UniProtKB/Swiss-Prot annotation:
<feature type="compositionally biased region" description="Gly residues">
    <location>
        <begin position="235"/>
        <end position="244"/>
    </location>
</feature>
<keyword id="KW-0597">Phosphoprotein</keyword>
<dbReference type="GO" id="GO:0033962">
    <property type="term" value="P:P-body assembly"/>
</dbReference>
<feature type="compositionally biased region" description="Low complexity">
    <location>
        <begin position="563"/>
        <end position="581"/>
    </location>
</feature>
<feature type="compositionally biased region" description="Polar residues">
    <location>
        <begin position="807"/>
        <end position="820"/>
    </location>
</feature>
<feature type="modified residue" description="Phosphoserine">
    <location>
        <position position="861"/>
    </location>
</feature>
<keyword id="KW-0523">Neurodegeneration</keyword>
<feature type="modified residue" description="Phosphoserine">
    <location>
        <position position="889"/>
    </location>
</feature>
<feature type="modified residue" description="Phosphoserine">
    <location>
        <position position="624"/>
    </location>
</feature>
<feature type="compositionally biased region" description="Polar residues">
    <location>
        <begin position="768"/>
        <end position="777"/>
    </location>
</feature>
<feature type="region of interest" description="Disordered">
    <location>
        <begin position="1137"/>
        <end position="1219"/>
    </location>
</feature>
<feature type="modified residue" description="Phosphoserine">
    <location>
        <position position="508"/>
    </location>
</feature>
<dbReference type="Pfam" id="PF14438">
    <property type="entry name" value="SM-ATX"/>
</dbReference>
<dbReference type="GO" id="GO:0005794">
    <property type="term" value="C:Golgi apparatus"/>
</dbReference>
<feature type="compositionally biased region" description="Pro residues">
    <location>
        <begin position="552"/>
        <end position="562"/>
    </location>
</feature>
<dbReference type="GO" id="GO:0050658">
    <property type="term" value="P:RNA transport"/>
</dbReference>
<feature type="modified residue" description="Phosphoserine">
    <location>
        <position position="642"/>
    </location>
</feature>
Length: 1313
């Protein structure tokens, strides 16, 4: 079929061919294949050396013998052996198609018959008007072995090839490169061909532009006039090198390939190869048209079509099966035109030739298959499909498979796993070689199976747990919400904001953990009971601090937990009286165990209550959870020694207070006992009641009164009547108390009572106190339970004294002292109560009595005094905290107050819920702690040192710091109340025993110095909680604050008072995690306690404060102690450091920083908490201490200043650091403490900073009074502090609170705090 579509070549076509020529296909040459067929006619169709790859000239030169005509196939391919290319008008090959060359829509490759006489050398119509670039998509059919398939860009449109016979054979170029690079040497054209060829030499394909053929789209060349025809491919300009074809790998390339015939024409090869696999129509000379798939071609242009059939014009339908022939070979002389339709000329250049691009399409097609809907037909397909869905057999039934295999394949299948049918069994033999190999194999197998990797892999394979169970599920125990179980907090979810504190302090969860044997229980109860505390600054913060000391427990569980350890028996036995640091001193070594046993003992609500009660009255309880615990331990140093190793010193504060906090701390984890102690109060109704208001201000347990309450609550554990004193005094200083003379013990008791009676005590006792003294709240809680359990506790303490020998000399004495304290405390409380109307009445009275007694005897017999103080303070811990400031008044005076208030306290105790808790706690604690029943919890006096400090205590304190080693970095003075319990040698010893307090190497010195200064202060003050081991509640590092600040100061009473308050204050603080334990003779620990309480975060432990020598204004001291209340602290510490501890999330830390700021700034920080008056006094005390103690407490000794603390003020800085998650508590090394205590300003500063940081919540002013233990002389910066933070503590005069320039006052202040 000839197509009129053929048109004269156009320049565009020429351009295209030029482009093909330019785009050389280097790979083609490698595809060259030897000519399979010898040329037709004269010689085989030797491919002429088609001279140039350049496009042929615009017009072909007319052959000499005839008119110019479109380029013929011979032009493109060279002569086909038919003579010189003369065209014979009449000659036809294969049904020859006579007539002038015409374009074919179908590219026909007529086979030229060799020897056909050439007609006139006229040119046949060019091979296709437009050169069709290769089409890679058409290479479906395999080319003949010798036919390469160069890749080329196909051009959509007809590709026409016409054959023109030529008489002259084109001479083969003798120089044919046989290399695969396909370099063609130009072949000299044969004589005739020379005329026929275009001057530029025709390429494989005559350049489209070179041919004047009429059609540009396709050209069909009629071979009618040509004796022979040659395939002419579209596209002109042959190019020498063979290009790289799409199917270049097809065929058998050989290194020795002679490019004959059309193979020598690069362009021709390129185009033909590119159309392999495409639909092709071949018109033969007889006019028939055959259609098929172009498969291959030979060098002589013989074509092979697959699936060929003759195309009939009549029927439009497809060919019949019988008409299709597998393949047909068309000789070059037989066909006229070959046409390839619908070629994509842009295919080659359309896409990138990258593997991904090529593989992205199937054979060049980009579109995806069209999906057709499936029709199930009329069968019951739905039912069948459903049946398949319901079929769970997973395919064949095994028996069916076995049967099928057997029937069809003769294979008998079984379930035998040995695969005997597929494997060859080992042939066992007894040869030596085989046995060796077998042994070696067994050895290797054993090694592999015993390897950790193998076991891990097997474990994974055998692990039935799901990914969720293994990695994402949160599993909690049903008892997690019960604060009393040891594992209560183990799996409890802790919000990220609270994790630091908890971890550092061995906080809530940990304190419950076995490590804090009892604390877990006591601490937990307090914690659970005051779960609110956790989240509630009032409730949670204090409770947590007191109860859990949780913050403390983790890092410094020893001190807090020490209370139990105090009891000679394990911490667990101690728990009931755990609060009482009496035993801990004896038990310093038990500190490790103290966590387990104490936690359990304290874990019980009752034990917690007992301790908290006492602490409540004492005020250290606040600190107890964190800082206070340490101070208590220190104070209890005697009993608490074991508990606190490091913290004991802190516990040292007032015997009661110290004892209680130590217990809590010991039990849980450093802070746990304190927590327990303070926590118990929380547990008790009183604890809860005061907690809400006081907790914030004091940072004690549940509420504002939490300080007192927590302590009270804790104490309740010891005895319903006077749980605090009992727990604290006896446990705190069983040994210490014994060591101390009964009179001294009594004095301690009185001091504590006084302290409790002091504003702090009032606060503790009365919620309203929240507003005024921060400790008041603590006392409030603790007093009622204290009164109720007072006698019980006393009995317990006596038993403990007899049963436990941790503090050989102080236990029995503690019992006596406790009894004395109770009496004294009642008197003192009455007095104090008069002064401080708030609920400090009962608790305060007892504390006052105790404190007075302690204070009086303390100087004479420090050992006894601490014991009494410890008992009283423990019992009165909360009260002491509240009244700690107030306790500034002389020991006797305080004693009277205590006695007076004792009655009130008894009433309160009856009302308080703490007593039951205290009882529970008592079982945990050693029975001896019960002696702390002496309700001298208020005991603001510096009696803490007598009992608490016990020689052992210092060691325990440090030990606890060791426990809280990280936290211990900053030994925070344990509640000064604790240390100041008594300036007894014990107190100094703790300081001296700073070695014991590993965390605070300098502690001993400080303590000694403080102790020396203590000369000025009451013995209690001196010995009291000089050790300020008040790491952040969460951190167990209690800074052992050498209570030695003012060992000689008359501040002894104050110290007991501090001790009492310390438990109260510290418990909260400890709970709050900010423990500013100033073992120094001040109630500074109370400060810390306060902050802790306020925050209810255990982190508050950092609220540590060194009590510089308070002016030893007994009244002022207690007040000062109160100042430590969280609120007070916050107010007290207007100091920027208060800001340092701005952790709002961590109330304790905040409390401490705030308190500190207030303390330092004196009046700068408004007292947010009701403990304001206490704060005021505390502030005074802080200021007093500030000069001497600020630097000391936050001394180089404290070198590792808690990060949160800003160096701005040594005291503050460390304290601030503790506030939140920091475990570091101010480590007030004895040396530092010494200067601190020696220099009231220094000490005051420390307490200020610490207390403020730890005591004050994130907002310094907002928090309830912090346990700002600033022991400042009446003179000193006390005024500012007292005014700002301590003002709420009217019991202790402002004068007392001023930075304690002289040690005595400072110690006393600590006690109060």
């Amino acid at each position: 079929m000839r197509s009129a579509a053929a048109a004269p070549r156009s320049p565009a076509v020429a351009t295209e061919s030029r482009r093909f020529a330019a785009a050389r296909w280097p790979g083609w040459r490698s595809l060259q294949r030897p000519a399979r067929r010898s040329g037709r006619g004269g010689g085989g169709a030797a491919p002429g050396p088609y001279p140039s790859a350049a496009p042929p000239p615009p017009g072909p030169g007319p052959p000499p013998s005839r008119q110019s005509s479109p380029p013929s196939a011979s032009d493109c391919f060279g002569s086909n052996g038919n003579g010189g290319g003369a065209f014979r008008p009449g000659s036809r090959r294969l049904l020859g198609l006579g007539g002038p060359p015409r374009p074919f829509v179908v590219l026909l490759l007529p086979l030229a018959s060799p020897g056909a006489p050439p007609a006139a050398p006229t040119r046949a119509s060019p091979l296709g008007a437009r050169a069709s670039p290769p089409r890679s998509g058409v290479s479906l059919a395999r080319p003949a072995p010798g036919c390469p398939r160069p890749a080329c860009e196909p051009v959509y449109g007809p590709l026409t090839m016409s054959l023109k016979p030529q008489q002259q054979q084109q001479q083969q170029q003798q120089q044919q490169q046989q290399q695969q690079q396909q370099q063609q040497q130009q072949q000299q054209p044969p004589p005739a061909a020379a005329n026929v060829r275009k001057p530029g030499g025709s390429g494989l394909l005559a350049s489209p532009a070179a041919a004047p053929s009429p059609s540009s789209s396709s050209v069909s060349s009629s071979s009618a006039t040509a004796p022979s025809s040659v395939v002419a491919a579209t596209s002109g300009g042959g190019r020498p090198g063979l290009g790289r074809g799409r199917n270049s790998n097809k065929g058998l390339p050989q290194s020795t390939i002679s490019f004959d015939g059309i193979y020598a024409n690069m362009r021709m090869v390129h185009i033909l190869t590119s159309v392999v696999g495409s639909k092709c129509e071949v018109q033969v000379k007889n006019g028939g048209i055959y259609e098929g798939v172009f498969k291959t071609y030979s060098p002589k242009c013989d074509l092979v079509l697959d699936a060929a059939h003759e195309k009939s014009t009549e029927s439009s339908s497809g060919p019949k099966r019988e008409e299709i022939m597998e393949s047909i070979l068309f000789k070059c002389s037989d066909f006229v035109v070959v046409q390839f339709k619908d070629m994509d000329s842009s295919y080659a250049k359309r896409d990138a030739f990258t593997d991904s691009a090529i593989s992205a399409k199937v054979n060049g097609e980009h579109k995806e298959k069209d999906l057709e809907p499936w029709d199930a037909g009329e069968l019951t397909a739905n039912e069948e499909l459903e049946a398949l869905e319901n079929d769970v057999s997973n395919g064949w039934d095994p028996n069916d498979m076995f049967r099928y295999n057997e029937e069809n394949y003769g294979v008998v299948s079984t379930y035998d796993s040995s695969l005997s049918s597929y494997t060859v069994p080992l042939e066992r033999d007894n040869s030596e070689e085989f046995l060796k190999r077998e042994a070696r194999a067994n050895q290797l197998a054993e090694e592999i199976e015993s390897s950790a990797q193998y076991k891990a892999r097997v474990a994974l394979e055998n692990d039935d747990r799901s990914e969720e169970e293994k990695y994402t599920a949160v599993q909690r125990n049903s008892s997690e919400r019960e604060g009393h179980s040891i594992n209560t907090r183990e799996n409890k979810y802790i919000p990220p904001g609270q994790r630091n504190r908890e971890v550092i302090s061995w906080g809530s969860g940990r304190q419950n953990s076995p490590r804090m044997g009892q604390p877990g229980s006591g601490s937990m109860p307090s914690r659970s009971t005051s779960h609110t505390s956790d989240f509630n600054p009032n409730s949670g913060s204090d409770q947590r601090v007191v109860n859990g000391g949780v913050p403390w427990p983790s890092p410094c569980p020893s001190p807090s937990s020490r209370p139990p350890s105090r009891y000679q028996s394990g911490p667990n036995s101690l728990p009931p009286r755990a609060a009482t640091p009496t035993r801990p001193p004896s038990r310093p070594p038990s500190r490790p165990s103290r966590p387990p046993s104490h936690p359990s003992a304290h874990g019980s609500p009752a034990p917690v209550s007992t301790m908290p009660k006492r602490m409540s009255s004492e005020g250290p309880p606040r600190m107890s959870p964190k800082a206070q615990r340490h101070p208590r331990n220190h104070r209890v140093s005697a009993g608490r020694g074991s508990i606190s190793s490091g913290l004991e010193f802190v516990s040292h504060n007032p015997p009661s207070e110290a004892a209680t906090p130590p217990v809590a701390r010991t039990s849980p984890s450093g802070g746990t006992w304190s927590s327990v102690v303070s926590g118990v109060p929380r547990l008790s109704p009183k604890t809860h009641r005061p907690r809400s208001p006081r907790q914030n201000s004091i940072g004690n347990t549940p509420s504002g009164p939490v300080l007192a309450s927590p302590q009270a609550g804790i104490i309740p554990t010891e005895a319903v009547a006077m749980p605090i004193p009992a727990a604290s005094p006896t446990p705190a200083s069983p040994a210490s108390n014994r060591a101390v003379t009964p009179s001294s013990e009594a004095k301690d008791s009185r001091l504590q009572d006084q302290r409790q009676n002091s504003p702090a005590g009032n606060k503790e006792n009365i919620k309203p106190n929240e507003t005024s003294p921060s400790f008041s709240k603590a006392e409030n809680k603790g007093i009622s339970p204290v009164v109720s359990e007072h006698r019980k506790q006393i009995d317990d303490l006596k038993k403990f004294k007899n049963d436990f020998r941790l503090q050989p000399s102080s236990t029995s004495e503690s019992m006596d002292q406790l009894l004395n304290k109770n009496r004294e405390g009642e008197k003192s409380r009455d007095l104090i109560k008069d002064k401080i109307e708030p609920s400090a009445k009962d608790s305060f009275i007892e504390n006052s009595s105790s404190n007075c007694t302690s204070g009086s005897s303390k100087p004479n017999s420090p050992s006894i005094s601490p014991s009494i103080l410890s008992n009283t303070e423990h019992k009165r811990g909360p009260e002491v905290t509240s009244q700690g400031v107030q306790t500034s008044s002389p020991a006797c005076k305080q004693e009277k107050d205590d006695k007076e208030e004792k009655k009130d306290a008894a009433e309160q105790v009856r009302k308080s819920t703490l007593n039951p808790n205290a009882k529970e706690f008592n079982p945990r604690s050693f029975s001896q702690p019960k002696p702390s029943t002496t309700p001298t919890s208020p005991r603001p006096q510096a009696q803490p040192s007598p009992s608490m400090v016990g020689h052992q205590q210092p060691t325990p304190v440090y030990t606890q710091p060791v426990c809280f080693a990280p936290n211990m970095m900053y030994p925070v003075p344990v509640s000064p109340g604790v240390q100041p319990l008594y300036p007894i040698p014990m107190t100094p010893m703790p300081v001296n025993q700073a070695k014991t307090y590993r965390a605070v190497p300098n502690m001993p010195q400080q303590r000694q110095d403080q102790h020396h200064q203590s000369a000025m202060m009451h013995p209690a003050s001196a010995a009291g909680p000089p050790i300020a081991a008040t790491p952040p509640a969460y951190s167990t590092q209690y800074v052992a604050y050498s209570p030695q600040q003012f060992p000689n100061q008359p501040l002894v009473q104050h110290v007991p008072h501090y001790q009492s308050q310390h438990p109260h204050v510290y418990s909260p603080v400890i709970q709050g995690n900010a423990r500013m334990m100033a073992p120094p003779t001040h109630a500074q620990p109370g400060l810390v306690s306060s902050s802790a309480t306020q925050y209810g975060a255990h982190e508050q432990t950092h609220a540590m404060y060194a009590c510089p020598k308070l002016p030893y204004n007994k009244e002022t001291s207690p007040s000062f102690y109160f100042a430590i209340s969280t609120g007070s602290l916050a107010q007290q510490y207007a100091h920027p450091n208060a800001t340092l501890h701005p952790h709002t999330p961590h109330p304790q830390p905040s409390a401490t920083p705030t308190g500190q700021q207030q303390s330092q700034h004196g009046g700068s920080h408004p007292a947010p908490s009701p403990v304001q008056h206490h704060q005021h006094q505390a502030a005074q005390a802080l200021h007093l201490a500030s000069p001497q103690q600020q630097s000391a407490i936050y001394h180089a000794g404290l070198a590792p200043t808690p990060p949160s603390m800003t160096p701005a003020s040594n005291t503050q800085s460390p304290q601030n650091s503790f506030p939140a998650a920091q475990q570091t508590v101010f480590t007030i090394h004895p040396s530092h403490v010494q200067p601190a205590y020696t220099n009231p300003p220094h000490m005051a500063h420390v307490p200020q900073a610490h207390v403020q940081s730890g005591m004050v919540p994130s907002h310094p002013t907002a928090h309830a009074p912090m346990m700002l233990m600033t022991t400042q002389p009446p003179g000193g910066p006390q005024a500012a502090l007292a005014q700002s933070a301590l003002q709420p503590i009217p019991v202790s005069t402002t004068a007392h609170f001023p930075y304690m320039t002289h040690p005595s006052v400072q110690a006393h202040h600590q006690q109060q705090l």
